Amino acid sequence: NQGIPQVVYTNAFLWSPDRGIISDKNTLTYPTTLRQTLFLNTGIQGAAAIFNRAMCEVIEQPLSYYAMHDHVLLLAGICFGEVHYLHESLMYYRQHEHNVTGNAPGSIAKKIALMWENRGVRLVNREHYEGLKAFYERFEAQIKGDDKQVIEAFLVMKAESFIVRAIRIIQYKFQLF
């Protein structure tokens, strides 16, 4: 449908020059709502994404801050159009020590170990918080009611206590993957 912004993501093999294929899937979750997305730091890699002209017209509007291009693409798809996923891995996503988002750990055991190792790290990093805030400031007038409430609830959590954050997460049914 060329009338609405659409993005299609494909999966990717995680690949390392030293080890070959680390994992046959880079993406393990497929968010289509803000409630599923906001605590992911928009963890869908956009290297294997395609989008239509209507999406291009949305994302070419400048923001005051960008976390990553992937972040804006997913937010725009969720707020203004459609997000689709092809679950097949269609490319190799190279892992190396200088990746902007860091190396993907590969196995489930390594992912759990990494989560334990980083247990003191905030759930949402500053860059993605500021990117969401800039997106909201730019598109506030166009964002629909429920999505607007979800973003506003998410943004105010930064200043709230742990207990209030936990209540808000339950109240708004945010997913913590």
State each model region's role.
Residues 1-106:
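Nucleotide-sugar donor-binding/catalytic module of glycosyltransferases
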Residues 39, 65-67, 72, 94-177:
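C-terminal subregions of glycosyltransferases and related glycan-biosynthesis enzymes
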